[in-house]
Amino acid sequence: MKKIAYIEIDTHAEIAQAFMDIMRDTKDFTVDYYFSKKIKDQISKNDEAVFLSDSSMILDQLKDKGYDLIIIGTVHRFFNTFLAITKKYNTAVIAHNLNFSKASKLDLVKSVFKKDVIYRLKLWLKEGLFYSSKVYQTSGTLLVLDKAMSSEKYQFLPLFYTKDYRAAENQDRVVVIPGGVSQKRRDYRYIFKTIQHSETNKPCEFVFLGKAKDSELKELEKLSQKLPENIRITYFSERVSAEDFEKWMQKADVLWCPIQEHTEFFSLKETYGVTKMTGNLGDAVAYGKWAVFPSGYPSKLDFIIPEKENILNQLNELTHLHFDFQKYYNKIEIQKKTEQILFRLISK
């Protein structure tokens, strides 16, 4: 059996969970997981080998283990540590922000003083910020989780599969907008305005499935007072628990994902679907849901539907249509593809 180490000591617990889920029951690989406490506390595990780690421990932990491949889930900090790993081992790095991954030193210096200055100075002075692009360059492979972002330089790693559960049977239509409620990521002003001026007679519940705060929370509180009787909204002022997320995603008839075309990471512009993946893509696959995206979003996937002018009619129509997610995204099929890619990375 081939031995893999998966490291996540920074941010993306949901990606670590997806990797753990798809590798569960594999016959050809054993995987050791190295997580920070923050990540470990968010992970649901069975009998996987999970080790508590951080940037000061990880190099010693990897020593003499004989791993065939090391996968680093996020390289957004601890650059000096990760550079040492990529120099010493056969490493694959998951790239989440492609423009950040190739940023020049000058780009990074400019970015340090634009926002979060104290934190970014810490990355510069203590964590090797200027090695960031070198970590990606030195890594044996760069991985992306959205096929549309793959190229000769970036290898697509399929992780998301559709879970087995019964289709939603709601008396009233349930539209879920998954993700943290932030105008930077999705156009919530447009959503609020559309819901407020909706002219549908059909009962409908809109669920904002992510933590709302600041101005967005105030807008939701105001909106909840102005709705017609047939429209309801559900929102959360605290972090959404895994149980609540699961419950509402299963209950959803359709996902509404009006993501912004552009966002920023480390004050560098990233474009959704081109240099940055949206987590809503994985949500749609995992729960087997139609997802309505902005008309300009670059996707060839059949279950990603470009938004039409009358979005509320469109959402209603989609609740009556079927897409066979299990045919294309069942766990056996996705696991097989993932294993083939891992074998290729090991034999490079």
Segment roles from a protein language model:
Residues 126-167, 177:
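Donor nucleotide-sugar binding/catalytic pocket of nucleotide-sugar-dependent glycosyltransferases
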Residues 219-254:
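Nucleotide-activated donor-binding/catalytic signature segment of Leloir-type glycosyltransferases, i.e.
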Residues 99-102, 106-141:
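Membrane-proximal helix-turn-helix segments that form the acceptor-binding/catalytic region
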